[in-house]
């Protein structure tokens, strides 16, 4: 087994390209007639020849089952305060840091470093991958996109990117927004007749950004409906109405507030409103400065449009059972609180419909605890403090090593295109097996072009085989198997 040491502080990472987005999904090969699931052998879980549902009946989805609130360790931190503060400092650097080594989109040093080539390269890659005349992608009507459609998208995206930093490019997100690979709401699916393609795997869907996220605008689309932006995690296109400009006075105030008191949401779909006025929907992964904490309440800063496209700060009151000061102590009972809100929600490739995929799930889950993870699985495993590569070991050794050395809630498990959080080990089907929390699309049989769909955030064991269908390839039995330790 190969051990790779990485710096104590979360490593810098490259802004992802859409083609590198790893989100619990593997590319298929073209099926033949012998590979398809026959309706005659289908159970009630049958969907169509390339899809069925995986039965979760044997795997409890109760958070209290896997994280008992009455256990002796429920209130014991799983990492020490100094380590947590180190990660929290890295998080604030990514969001608000303005020094030469910081990577905030409001940081002129950082933006200047990527303007020369990276921003243009990302766009060019998307042009070549999705709009080339020989490239075929499908729309929501199961028909291939036309040459005319491709040219319209290319023309709308083909505006100039200034290679010089301008302070006027700084913006902030005022409501959660989807990030697209190109400026269109139209999907671009690979062949929907193949397993693991079509819905929900829209190649243009990259990620989402939460309200309060600092961004830098690189360019407008030709129709002005979209902005091409740099965020702390991705480069892509967002709707123009979801962001507003920030001036130096706003940046100074917002950064000062965030450095003093930064908080995070710990529940899904919190409607942020005041005096009958709705502002945005928040969920885990949304972080905002706050001014003070009153009994049962926080007074929280939210960015709003002042009416002329510029940001101003509005103060709203939030309950302390939905918003907490960061970094929240990383204890089993606290992480269980967040999981109770997040678990059981549908899978969303690239945050489609603001649901999570595998990497978005962990990014959002760990944010309240001051731990900033990148936005794709391959970068997330490299962002941990220490990586153990078990790719050359067999399934038995992989399971035994994780049972013996895994640290609950601070060990990430990576396989190609997918990532999970180890939460401890338990006896499952008479075997001592690692348990995970993950957001997963599904499992696949070896050599069979079909998917057994789970389709959401679940507690799931890393069994060598699954009795529900022994032909399914285990998540432990993949070409790569790496453990990343947050420590």
Task: List PLM regions with ranges.
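Low-complexity, Gly/Ser/Thr/Pro-rich intrinsically disordered linker/tail segments
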Residues: 50, 55-71, 75, 433-435, ...
């Amino acid at each position: 087994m190969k051990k790779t040491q990485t710096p104590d502080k979360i490593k810098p990472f490259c802004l992802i390209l859409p083609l590198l987005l790893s989100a619990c999904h593997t590319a298929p090969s073209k099926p033949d007639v012998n590979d398809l699931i026959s309706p005659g052998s289908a159970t009630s879980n049958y969907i169509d020849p390339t899809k069925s549902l995986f039965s979760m009946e044997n795997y409890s989805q109760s958070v209290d089952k896997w994280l008992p609130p009455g256990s002796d360790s429920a209130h014991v931190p799983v990492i020490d305060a100094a380590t947590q503060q180190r990660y929290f400092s890295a998080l604030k650097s990514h969001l608000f840091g303005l020094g030469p080594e910081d990577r905030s989109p409001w940081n002129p040093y950082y933006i200047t470093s990527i303007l020369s080539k990276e921003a243009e390269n990302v766009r060019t890659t998307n042009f070549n991958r999705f709009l080339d005349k020989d490239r075929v992608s499908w729309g929501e009507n199961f028909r291939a996109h036309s040459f005319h459609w491709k040219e319209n998208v290319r023309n709308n995206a083909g505006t100039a990117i200034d290679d010089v930093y301008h302070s006027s490019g700084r913006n902030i997100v005022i409501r959660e927004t989807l990030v697209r690979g190109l400026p269109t709401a139209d999907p671009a699916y690979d062949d929907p007749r193949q397993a693991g393609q079509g819905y929900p795997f829209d190649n243009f869907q990259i990620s989402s950004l939460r309200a309060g996220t600092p961004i830098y605008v690189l360019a407008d689309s030709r129709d002005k409906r979209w902005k091409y932006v740099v965020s702390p995690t991705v480069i892509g296109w967002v709707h123009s109405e979801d962001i507003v400009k920030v001036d130096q006075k706003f940046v100074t105030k917002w950064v000062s507030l965030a450095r003093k008191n930064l908080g995070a949401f710990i529940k899904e779909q919190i409607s942020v409103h005041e005096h009958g006025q709705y502002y945005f929907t928040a969920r885990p992964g949304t972080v905002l400065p706050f001014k003070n904490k009153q009994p049962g309440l926080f007074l929280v800063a939210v960015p709003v449009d002042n009416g002329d496209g510029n940001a101003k700060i509005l103060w709203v009151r939030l309950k302390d059972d939905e918003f907490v000061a960061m970094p929240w102590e990383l204890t089993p009972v606290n992480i269980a609180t967040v999981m109770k809100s997040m678990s059981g929600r549908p899978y969303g490739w690239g945050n489609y419909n603001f649901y999570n995929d595998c990497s978005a799930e962990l990014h959002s889950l760990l944010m309240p605890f001051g731990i900033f993870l990148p936005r794709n699985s391959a970068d997330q495993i490299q962002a941990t403090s220490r990586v153990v590569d078990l790719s050359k070991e067999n399934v038995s050794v992989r399971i035994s090593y994780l049972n013996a050395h895994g640290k609950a809630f601070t060990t990430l498990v990576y396989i190609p295109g997918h990532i999970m959080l180890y939460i401890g080990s338990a006896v499952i089907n008479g075997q001592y097996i690692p348990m995970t929390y993950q957001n997963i699309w599904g499992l696949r049989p070896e050599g069979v072009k079909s998917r057994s769909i789970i389709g959401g955030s679940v507690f799931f064991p890393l069994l060598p085989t699954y009795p529900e269908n022994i032909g399914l390839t285990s998540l432990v039995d993949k070409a790569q198997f790496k453990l990343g330790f947050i420590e």
